[in-house]
């Protein structure tokens, strides 16, 4: 058997003698979640875990990866994660520009999402109401300013604080 088949999140070269309990202990020390036993039997080839391991074992060959290869993979994973985080932050920045906010608002990501959801609900209410005529519903700058003002008033009246707790 190959050493790769029992890859642990702690060390890529753990021996096969590590039991699942030992792996769980190692994961709990690192703050990781326990793995679920998704397989019905260890021989089940349709298991997501065994498919992943088979793919990994076949791509690396019979020798364990060198330290340099592992370090290179880690660096690449860090680069991908940094790019993903940067992309996510840029998306939140764009969302914050779209949502009408008060000058004093410094919104966290979760607050931004909740406020965006409330703003969408508010816009749906505006569209469904007969209060606005067709001229005001156009996408002009004045209409946008009026909607922003109406949303700010709506927030200040307490509708935001009541609905944000959901």
Curated annotation (Swiss-Prot):
SMART domains: HLH. Residues 28-39 have a biased composition (Basic residues). It comes from Xenopus laevis (African clawed frog). Probable transcription factor, which may be involved, with other proteins, in establishing the pattern of cell type-specific gene expression in mesodermal cell subgroups. It is found in: Nucleus. The keyword Cell membrane does not apply. Residues 1-83 are annotated as: Disordered. Induction: Expressed in the mesoderm and the neural crest in response to two sequential early inductions (mesodermal and neural). InterPro entries: bHLH_dom (IPR011598), E-box_TF_Regulators (IPR050283), HLH_DNA-bd_sf (IPR036638), TWIST1_bHLH (IPR047093). One of its GO terms (molecular function) is protein dimerization activity. This is Twist-related protein. Keywords: Developmental protein, Differentiation, DNA-binding, Nucleus, Transcription, Transcription regulation.
């Amino acid at each position: 058997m190959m050493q790769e088949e029992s890859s642990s999140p702690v060390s890529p070269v753990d021996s096969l003698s590590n039991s699942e309990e030992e792996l769980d202990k190692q994961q709990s020390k690192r703050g990781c979640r326990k793995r679920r036993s998704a397989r019905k039997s260890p021989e089940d080839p349709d298991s997501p875990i065994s498919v992943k391991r088979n793919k990994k074992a076949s791509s690396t060959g019979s020798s364990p990866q060198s330290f340099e290869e592992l370090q290179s993979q880690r660096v690449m994973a860090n680069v991908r994660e940094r790019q993903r985080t940067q992309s996510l932050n840029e998306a939140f920045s764009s969302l914050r520009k779209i949502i009408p906010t008060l000058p004093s608002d410094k919104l966290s990501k979760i607050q931004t999402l909740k406020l965006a959801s409330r703003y969408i609900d508010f816009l749906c209410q505006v569209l469904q109401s007969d209060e606005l005529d067709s001229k005001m519903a156009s996408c002009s700058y004045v209409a946008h300013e009026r909607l922003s003002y109406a949303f700010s008033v709506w927030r200040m009246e307490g509708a935001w604080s009541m609905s944000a707790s959901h």
